Amino acid sequence: MEEIHRYLQPDRSQQHNFLYPLIFQEYIYALAHDHGLNRNRSILLENPGYNNKFSFLIVKRLITRMYQQNHFFISTNDSNKNSFLGCNKSLYSQMISEGFAFVVEIPFSLRLISSLSSFEAKNIFKSHNLRSIHSTFPFLEDNFSHLNYVLDILIPYPVHLEILVQTLRYWVKDASSLHLLRFFLHEYWNLNSLITSKKPGYSFSKKNQRFFFFLYNSYVYECESTFVFLRNRSSHLRSTSFGALLERIYFYVKIERLVEVFAKDFQVTLWLFKDPFMHYVRYQGKSILASKGTFLLMNKWKFYLVNFWQCHFSLCFHTGRIHINQLSNDSRDFMGYLSSVRLNPSMVRSQMLENSFLINNAIKKFDTLVPIIPLIGSLAKANFCTVLGHPISKPVWSDLSDSYIIDRFGRICRNLFHYYSGSSKKKTLYRIKYILRLSCARTLARKHKSTVRAFLKRSGSELLEEFLTSEEQVLSLTFPRASSSLWGVYRSRIWYLDIFCINDLANYQ
């Protein structure tokens, strides 16, 4: 148990990071503002304006107000008298959260750099391909098709804002910074505006997203801290029963000794009791724990996680938030794809002497499809079509030039084909392409006050050739030597390593 406590004990090497003075520096808010401009680039639409009211004059006024206040107590009965943001409460709170998020990320960056060797630090930017969303799907394709059961876990949300503050106390040793964070959360935010549990995932306020994503990721990191330890223990004790290890964690030394005795006496490897392979994936407030083990083992994992989160985080967590599903019968929305493991039947004819017989084999295959109904819902929400999938014009773009309208529609179509290049079936993409193409034509016809047929007859069909060659252009750049068999390549699944965020239309949740 001492080893467990030592492992779960946080690193104390970053205990002298005094971050509170940085909050009163003007350049911190400028860096946070520039970081937000570079990060909030939309694929569907241009950035409507990160914060046009940002200026150093507002920053100076904010810092002056912060200097003049006393934050050593939180007034619960008379909160109106303790307000220091004044009339621009929303603007100032957003600026504080951006600056604070930028400051508290410094210890994490220092910890990452110190953990890397000098060689890895020089080549840290060369590993950007691993950040691609598509890099996850080959991993699932190679590993999940051989597993049996999966735990579908809805990550528990903190029932109190103080839990979010306590998760940072191991990383940020500056008490003043933690006190300001606690004051900010309790004074200007409540739990309903921070995290809502009505949806399958978590929805954050559109303002201060970086700040709350940082708090949420820190909290999830604490929730997942046990997986690393248990995985290391299972790898170290490969010849022990991992189920028994979970139930009798106090006696793992005795179990290890018992394995040595069995191995010495029988001279065999106890392969029957080896830990089945476990794979863990987290996405959008959910997590998946897949295993090759039995239903009984997955049920033990379920109750173990519930008890751990209840005791460690004081959460009211019930077993209904964790579901055990068989992979062959499980289908889920994952990163905009509809992913499932299905049985692909195949028949083999075998002949032995004069007798011949047929052998039916069922091979598990990881399948990825485009969810057509949610995607049409996203297009309808963006005013490209109705909820039934009928294309409509986009009046807000009617004031733009014809070439710019075509370029926008073509860019959206190319991005969708690029993002869904790993789909097993491409027919859905052609329906989406038809909707966007006709929506573009109706937008242009609305601009010129004409019908679609009359406009296309007057302008020529080559006006919309942007949509005819969108996916072929992407593939010709990727596979320049495969032009002869381009159709066969296009029908296969292709995973790209340059996709770092979910497409706006694919992120329908």
Swiss-Prot record:
User: What InterPro entries is this protein classified in?
Assistant: Domain_X, Maturase_MatK, Maturase_MatK_N
What GO CC annotations are associated with the protein? chloroplast
> Main localisation, per the record?
plastid
> Has UniProt tagged this entry with the keyword Isomerase?
no
Question: Which controlled-vocabulary keywords does the entry list?
Answer: Chloroplast, mRNA processing, Plastid, RNA-binding, tRNA processing
Give one GO term, molecular function aspect: RNA binding
One example of a Gene Ontology biological process annotation? RNA splicing
Name of a matching Pfam family: Intron_maturas2
Entry annotated with the keyword ATP-binding: no
Role summary: Usually encoded in the trnK tRNA gene intron. Probably assists in splicing its own and other chloroplast group II introns.
Family designation: Belongs to the intron maturase 2 family. MatK subfamily.
Which named protein is this? Maturase K
Q: Point out the gene that encodes the protein.
A: matK
